[in-house]
Amino acid sequence: MSGHSSGAHLAGVVLVTDWRKAFNLPTDTVKGGLCCSGMFDLKPVRLSARSSYVKFTDEMEQTLSSQRHLDKLNVPVIVAYGTLETPEFQRQSRDFAAAVKTAGKPVELLVGEGYNHFEIPETLANPYGLLGRAVLAQMGLASR
């Protein structure tokens, strides 16, 4: 499961979904994750100017903040961001990776030196790119 930006937020939610409880699917339906430059704790969104059009309730914020549900995470996760991204995307990615590690779950934090928010996901298309190489290794299809 992979996602970038808002897609990384959604990927994070998918990664902490209890597949057996929600859909009667095997718990290992998802095998691994890549979350690139996403939002994993939605409280800052509610505190920002976006709150004028993003109307979250406390319950929605709690439910959709994947960083708060890491007890349900059961797959390895790659978290990535670029050094030319906004400070909030960088912070959210670092904090998410740290929280996953603290929860005792397998995580790899990748920092794309010189990549902005729109360039870093392009490295997924290249098997030798930062994200492409990491995902192939996570899948057991290439060495690091």
Predicted regions and their residues:
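Alpha/beta-hydrolase superfamily serine-hydrolase fold, recognizing
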Residues: 1-144
